[in-house]
Amino acid sequence: TEKRKNEPTKLIDDNGAKILKLQIGNIQKTNLLEKGISTLTLESKFKRGIEKYFNEVKFDLVLYSTPPITLQKAVEFIKQRDNAKTYLLLKDIFPQNAVDLGMIQTKGIKCLIYRYFKKKEDSLYKISDYIGCMSNANIEFLLKNNASIHNGIIEVCPNSIEPIDINITEYEQKQIREKYGVPIDKTVFIYGGNLGKPQGIDFLIKCIRENQGNEKSYFLIVGSGTEFGKLQVFFEKVKPKNAMLLNQLPKRDYEILANSCDVGLIFLDRRFTIPNFPSRLLSYMQASMPILASTDVNTDIGRVIENGEFGFWCESSDAKEFNSLVIKLCDKNLRRWMGTNARKYLEENYTAKHSYEIIIKHFK
């Protein structure tokens, strides 16, 4: 629980499961300095919490994910104390992602920050008995750039969910679109989620600007983040007729609105050398929605989407190609076919049961 909520650390019982709700510093929706300090203090807070609340508990398996990479000492403490096995779910490769975006330098005085976090990253890999990556491209990147990692401990263990059926009537879809002024007679492309540096917002703006002549499509951008202000300035200045920007919505309204759209959008900055694999993909697939991904060339999310025949991909530097794919996806029959493929692919590859079986096979 972040400090801003003013809730003390507490241990709760949820149907027999003991959950420790630690009070930590503010990490989300704050400035970089506060976020950095809060992230650095995480492992000491976790370690103290484990010692205080779980001193008599013996753990057999520790599951942990990135971000953040600053839990190494807490994981190592349990591993040594309880002789526990450790499994890292590698959802983000830091600090290289920050280097790619120019946020951290590898040379000069500023390289000290990089060296600190790189050491943390190496230590996290070292204490991990197994490493589950989001995709094959992640495995290739990790092995190529970390000679100390043995390929026998690394495998694909992708993001996953427990799929639910999305049941929204045509009346509800029409009602929610009318409530927020979203056209009911156009193909609506939605981006929902973080609006930060990793998303390459400048390219998103370029796509909206260059697609204004398409009378069949409409862009709905819903989210928050460090780049929201840049988008807001663009919308206030240009007032694009083919797009809408929304910040925060009531949870139920967002769920209905998002699932009343036609195509899910994924954006990644073209400068990335690490193969990101955004979890946003899964919510689109759950809604039987085709996906248009515009990313760097190093991620394999585009290959997964196109091989599964549930969407299209283009590089996040080619607005003309992006807009040609937008035109293709204005075909209702194509969207219906791809949407069905998306849901099927999700159920066959990205369920919580699949992830469980990948992890637990090591401990049977």
Residue ranges and their predicted role:
Residues 73, 77-81, 111-133:
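Membrane-proximal helix-turn-helix segments that form the acceptor-binding/catalytic region
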Residues 199, 250-257, 264-285, 290-303:
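Nucleotide-sugar-dependent
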Residues 6-10, 167-182:
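A short helix/loop element that forms part of the nucleotide-sugar donor recognition site in Leloir-type
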Residues 216, 220-223, 228-255:
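Nucleotide-activated donor-binding/catalytic signature segment of Leloir-type glycosyltransferases, i.e.
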Residues 183-199, 205-208:
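Conserved donor-binding/catalytic core segment of Leloir-type glycosyltransferases
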Residues 27-34, 57, 82-119, 164:
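Acceptor-binding helix/loop patch of EC 2.4 sugar-transfer enzymes
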